[in-house]
């Protein structure tokens, strides 16, 4: 005697040599439906993770996650908001010098942003890959390192000169033509493959203070680098710093951030649809089995098998289909993800010629699998309830 009996019967109902071909096809299609749903969900989420990680590395690693400043963008270092130190998720707080300027060359004019940097603090400049140019940014000469795209726009190269113009804040000074103008020699060009290549100009911090006419101990503000820039409670920071202007990366990248949120909602919608289709497959498969096995169910009941164990038979049947489908889909998705070249080749056939970043999250894969299995098992409840609601005498009398 096979024990436990309900597991043996459930697995026999799933697959045995005497099962009609039509039922085998239904079971195979149910497993394939779940597998395709799982694999498409995992691949899509992995691609979204890749884009999010690329966004974090290519853009958020070069811009401040939070900026604390005032209306004039000119603030005394001694007024540092100490309440900020109480915040969690903060990796680093540093002061900075920054200003938008007009860039002028012989025949070109553009808008850029100067960043005053401390050449002794190389840690914050690692992503720029400018180690070989960094020594040129000493305070004795007005030198600059500019982005590669900006250099192309201005048609300049190393050793060329550019004129930087700072517009005054007040209209009176503007009408009096009281402008800060300085010639800078280009001593390096950086390329980060991000948008900062189009506008950033790195100059020595002391030169930036002199060029912008900042008083002693005055700065533009403080920039905060977060451990995870996607975990951001800007309202809490504003409450702690009521006398300052608080700007976060979402303000600067608002449209892009909204697009990412919309993508997540669309992904959630498709995830729910796939769940519904998978559950529907299980319901159809189990309902057909229940209708076919009505006589068997009545015989089991008349032989003393409890309704609870009859329920377990069909739970075993439904959960096995779900687990096999989930395992199949997960394996296929992981194989495709690791074959990045093949996946990129498929995407390039149907879409444009772009490189798709992919990042696997084992926790997300586990969560997807558990959710699918749990909900598909829940979907077995209706066929099971249908199976046990009738009495054995009524079923057998109908035959």
UniProtKB/Swiss-Prot annotation:
Compartments (UniProt record): Cell membrane
Annotated function: Part of an ATP-dependent transport system responsible for the release of lipoproteins targeted to the outer membrane from the inner membrane. Such a release is dependent of the sorting-signal (absence of an Asp at position 2 of the mature lipoprotein) and of LolA.
Cellular component GO terms, alphabetical: plasma membrane protein complex
Pfam family, one: MacB_PCD
Bilayer topology: Multi-pass membrane protein
Keywords: Cell membrane, Membrane, Transmembrane, Transmembrane helix, Transport
BP GO terms, sorted: lipoprotein localization to outer membrane
UniProt record similarity statement: Belongs to the ABC-4 integral membrane protein family. LolC/E subfamily.
Annotated TM spans: 25-45, 266-286, 312-332, 358-378
Protein's name according to its UniProt entry: Lipoprotein-releasing system transmembrane protein LolC
InterPro entries referenced in this protein's UniProt entry, alphabetically: ABC3_permease_C, Lipoprotein-release_system, MacB_PCD
